[in-house]
Amino acid sequence: MQPEYRIVQNIKKLIRSRGGWCVKIHGGPYQDAGTPDILACYKGRFIAIEVKTSRGVARPEQKVTQRAITGSGGYALITHLIGDVADVLDAIDEL
């Protein structure tokens, strides 16, 4: 199992290596609850990624945010696998 920060770093490297933009969001008292860990743009598409360790569980507000993003036409996922992010990037490539 990789620590969450290492998973985040690997996901950021993947997105950037494919020409995308991304930023790690650091939560705090002024941050909306449920804001994903990584916000990205890839080929004009908005992607929000909540990173968990393999034992991590999404909080209810994270699930609400995920539904709001997908309902607005963006891509949102909660994952601990870099392969899940690669799958989203591949799907965007095929649009």
Predicted segments, located by residue:
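Catalytic phosphate/metal-binding cores of nucleic-acid and nucleotide-processing enzymes, i.e., regions
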Residues: 1-95
